[in-house]
Amino acid sequence: DDFGSKTLYLKIIYVDYELHFCVIELIGEWNDAIENDIMMLKREIGDELMKKGISKFIFIAENVLNFHSSDNEYYREWYDEVSDEEGWIIILNMPAATQQDFIKKKLPYYMELMELPEWRSYKPYHLFTKIDTELRQRIS
């Protein structure tokens, strides 16, 4: 669905207001350099979900075929906001070629890259608990 970007689209697959998480699939070209997609994604989707208590975001990015970076201002801002609520942002299954610019700009500090090719075999709750458990184990 359209959220304001000319090149990146998304589908909100699932939202759990009790456990404060959502699963969103991204499709297309993520272009911060020209379109400032992260600003639109944060303002139009992230901020609206956070107003409703969502602090844990799972973005499935296996169909994001290109990534063009700019600065990290909105990544940092979003990271700070979800961290204040003990939340996190995960980018799941971003293609290796797409990850290069993402990693070069050190954006995984704000949105962690994770691989889980079989994500479709999980119900949303089980996908969330698997990711959340893995993140908690890394911290401890």
Task: Give the role of each language-model region.
Residues 1-4, 9-17, 22-63, 67-140:
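Amphipathic, Lys/Arg-enriched alpha-helical "gate/interface" segment within cytosolic domains
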